Every structure is written in structure tokens, then in C-alpha cells.
Amino acid sequence: MKYSVFILFFVLFGCKSVQQINQQKVENAITKNALQLLEDKRFHSVSIAVLKDGKSTIKHFGELTIGKGNKPNDSTLYELASVTKTFTGYVAAKAVLDKKINLDDDIRIYLDESYPNLEFKGEPITIKHLITHTSGFPNMPLKSENKEAFFEGLKLIKIETKPGEVYSYSNTAPELTAYILERVYQKSFEELVSEFVLKPNKMSQTKFTLNENDRRRLVKGYNDKNELMPNFTRTLWGGISGLHSTTTDLVKYMRLQLDQSNLIVNESHKKLYKEGTDFWEGYHWYIIENDNQLIYRHHGGIYGMQNWFVIYPKQNIGISILTNTSFDETGKILEKVVDSLYDDIIK
């Protein structure tokens, strides 16, 4: 009996030790890569969240305000910028499963006017084309001061390639997707994101609309000349950008995206358009798959901050990195940090 108790104690203690070692390994990897990033003096702070095998690790470095030493923390609110599109993709995937929309629907069936210009030689633009950046829409909306102007801008678009054939990143298309989702559910896009994503996953710190307390926690970012940049002002639906979140909430979002029993997640991760040898577009996810790896990821960049959100389902890992700096090379630099961090974690 004593021998059995000893064995049980040894097993439990051994398991705990392994968990502690793995946790320390993740913490060390985060610290190493964060400090290396901050050696580039264009960066002032960085927050990194990692979820591995259900265990989260969050660390913050640097200062939010130059010269103040005010390190970010778990309550710091970041602008997610284009990572918001993955929420748009999730709601769109739910709409497909709910049979509210069909990927092959001509988008004009959801519009109040005819828009004869939104086709190419008789080939219509579909929901799938909007979601995969293959619609032929311009990058930025031609008019975006308000929703009414947005639809006037749609009339000015000239489609010059067959929809579904050429990838061209568009911030116009996801806004139209958000409008269509509003129309089929008869709820605002903000309500849909809250009802389908935020509330079920207890992401109470992720939101489009901020109150006074939220605004005090919102990051103010810089460009590479250390000039303070404005926060994004949403004038349309929020299909392309507009969500704010914390590292703790982003860990909850990782848990959602790693839940392979979730039918909406599985739908949103489907490969809808093949862009390269091992590169696909999903429901606003960039998907990389080859013999060695499967990755779902998205980058977000706005005037004064940038971030990457990356999921590795085979390894049960999620990584989010956020910084209060934005310039042309920021995305590529952060991408390399994520790659290095991932390599250090799985060594």
C-alpha cells in the first residue's frame, strides 16, 4: 500500500514538474524574443500571449508612453485592426451554417439597387469572392465617410478581372459582407459579433464601442518617427477593423479557434481559394499548410499599432503579439518574431 502511494505521489509530482518546465520554457521564449524586438528602438512596447496545450502565458514589455515607463498590462486595450476580419469571417461562417447566406450567392441579391457594374462580362461577384479577396473590389472603399456614401461608392467601382480568379486584398469587400450579415440576421454587425463570438466565450473586454474607462486603457501608438498617431475612427460597419481587445481576451479567442469540435470554427477554417503552393484563403484566415505544418493567421495594422494573431492547431498552440508602433516594415518584423517564438517553444 505504501509503495502504491509512493508511486502515485511520484507520478503526480513528476507531471507537475513537467508542466512547470514547459511553462518556464514558454516564458523564457517570450522574454527572449520580446527583448530582441525592443532592441530596435522604433519599438516602445510589446505584449505577447501564448496558449499551449490549454495553458496560457502572457507577458508585457517596454513602455506605452515614451519616457514614462508605463508598461502595458493585461487590462491594456489594443486596436485589433484587420484581425477584426477574422470575427467577420466567423459570423459569415455561422450564417452559411444557418443557411442565411450561400457562398455562391450573387451579392446583388442583398442590395437595394441593381449595381450592374458589380460583375465582369456577366460573371457576378459572390459572397465567396468577398470573403477571399477575389471580388475585384478596390482596397479602400471609394467613399467611406458614412454608410450611405459607401453604397454610392459601390456604383463607381469598375470590375476589371473575373471574380474568383485574382487575389487582391480589399478593405471594401468585408464591409459589404458585414452589411449583408446585418441584413440577413436583422441585427447590427456589432450585435452579431457580440452574440456569436464575444458573449459565448466570455470576451467581455473585446468591443467595438468604448466607454470612458475603456478609452483611458486604450493604447496610443507611434510611427517610426516617434510621432503620436490617432486611433481609428469607425464610420462603417466594422467588417474590416474597429475591434479593441486585451491579451487575456485574445487567449480566449485562441481557445475558440483551437476548438476543433466547434462547427463554426471548422467552417471558417475551410480552404476557399488557393493562392499559392501551400497558401489558401479561408473565411478571412490566411492558411498555410504543407507536410510539416498547418497555420491559420492574420495580421492587423493601423495608424499607431500592429499585431499578429496565429493559430497552430496540430501543435495546439496560439500566439498573439501586439505593439504600439506602426510603420511599413512592422508587420514583417513581427512576423519574424512570431516564427522565432514558435520555433523556440516547440524545440
Predicted regions and their residues:
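Sec-dependent N-terminal signal peptides
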Residues: 4-12
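Catalytic loop of the DD-peptidase/beta-lactamase superfamily, centered on the K-T-G motif
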Residues: 15-62, 182-185, 191-195, 199, ...
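Extracytoplasmic/secreted proteins, especially bacterial periplasmic and envelope-associated proteins
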Residues: 25, 29-36, 82, 87, ...
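Short active-site loop at a secondary-structure junction
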Residues: 39-47, 67-129, 161-172, 238-241, ...
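Acidic-glycine-rich active-site phosphate/pyrophosphate-binding loop
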Residues: 60-68, 148-152, 221-226
